[in-house]
């Protein structure tokens, strides 16, 4: 019975296609609504995202081939919206970004593989704002820029 379930899941997933317009369609050419998954050729999950009217809406999770989380993204009606977090292959958080309506908006952070904060940036609706900071590998502040 388990084999039948897996086969049905693969078959139903194969019927969702991405159109030239970047939207996802069900087999009847209707815009797809629901959970969409992509897989690596080895069978491991590469991406899981929710689609509404054929576009990303809500959380999207991207995975490395080893199964570790690579990115967590947020969308609203197909646009970048909310927090995006990136991890390295070992599961260490290396970046955090914020978007509103597909524009960089809010604080952005970049860490090195040892979890040392290296950069802090600020955007307001796509424009560089505030104080941007840079730290060295020991965590000492080395540069500040004001926008």
Predicted regions and their residues:
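Glycine/tyrosine- and acidic-biased, solvent-exposed loop/turn segments at the edges of beta-strands
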Residues: 10-147
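Bacterial N-terminal signal peptides
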Residues: 1-9
């Amino acid at each position: 019975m388990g084999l039948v379930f897996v086969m049905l899941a693969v078959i139903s997933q194969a019927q969702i296609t991405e159109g030239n317009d970047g939207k996802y369609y069900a087999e009847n050419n209707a815009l797809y609504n629901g959970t969409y998954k992509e897989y690596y050729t080895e069978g491991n999950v590469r991406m899981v995202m929710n689609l509404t009217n054929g576009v990303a809406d809500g959380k999207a999770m991207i995975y490395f081939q080893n199964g570790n989380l690579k990115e967590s993204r947020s969308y609203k009606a197909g646009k970048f919206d909310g927090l995006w977090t990136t991890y390295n292959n070992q599961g260490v958080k290396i970046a955090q970004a914020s978007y509103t309506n597909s524009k960089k908006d809010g604080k952005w952070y970049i860490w090195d593989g040892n979890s040392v904060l290296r950069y802090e940036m600020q955007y307001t609706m796509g424009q560089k704002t505030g104080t941007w900071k840079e730290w060295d590998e020991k965590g000492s502040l080395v540069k500040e820029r004001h926008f």
